[in-house]
Amino acid sequence: MSSIPISVEGFKQLEKELDRLKKERPGVIQAIKEAREEGDLSENAGYDAARERQGMLEARIKYIESRMAQFNVIDLDTISGDKVMFGATVKIEDLESGEEKEYTLLGPDEADYAKGSISVQSPVARAMLGKEEGDEIVVDAPRGKIHYEIVSIRFLGTKGQQR
């Protein structure tokens, strides 16, 4: 089983979610019990909804617990360097269009494209890993190969200060 990188902050967020889900569990069980007491389960929408919620809740708890055993927790405040790696914020330029994009490389369980972070397992991140400023990378995309240049590499850590 390989380890999955995650930041300390990302790990804490999942711990909070797991705790919240476990606290929600008794309420869902109670809702099932109450719906069951209403009688005929074949036409009991409340029962069906509560059972569905229980299934989703238990699946998410199981998923988080199994992932936590695989995590390699990395403190973003302790990493720096001149090569792209987990935790780096990387600016790249599309060599054809000139468009610039900036991504922070995080683990798959905390990446959020809308917030500018991508998984280190994504095709773009995999092409960048180990590269330096000025290096050219090629990403296989649905529209074909895209050539980028790495413009800058920064390590901001959790305090937002560049190292």
UniProtKB/Swiss-Prot annotation:
Source domain of life: Bacteria
HAMAP family assigned to the protein according to its UniProt record, in alphabetical order: GreA_GreB
Coiled-coil ranges from the UniProt annotation: 11-38
InterPro entries assigned to the protein according to its UniProt record, in alphabetical order: GreA/GreB_C_sf, TF_GreA/GreB_CS, Tscrpt_elong_fac_GreA, Tscrpt_elong_fac_GreA/B, Tscrpt_elong_fac_GreA/B_C, Tscrpt_elong_fac_GreA/B_fam, Tscrpt_elong_fac_GreA/B_N, Tscrpt_elong_fac_GreA/B_N_sf
PANTHER family, alphabetized: TRANSCRIPTION ELONGATION FACTOR GREA (PTHR30437:SF4)
Gene Ontology MF terms in the entry: DNA binding; RNA polymerase binding
Family: Belongs to the GreA/GreB family.
The name this protein goes by in its record: Transcription elongation factor GreA
Keywords of the record: Coiled coil, DNA-binding, Transcription, Transcription regulation
Biological processes annotated in GO: DNA-templated transcription elongation; regulation of DNA-templated transcription elongation
Summary of the function given for this chain in its UniProt record: Necessary for efficient RNA polymerase transcription elongation past template-encoded arresting sites. The arresting sites in DNA have the property of trapping a certain fraction of elongating RNA polymerases that pass through, resulting in locked ternary complexes. Cleavage of the nascent transcript by cleavage factors such as GreA or GreB allows the resumption of elongation from the new 3'terminus. GreA releases sequences of 2 to 3 nucleotides.
One Pfam family matching this protein: GreA_GreB
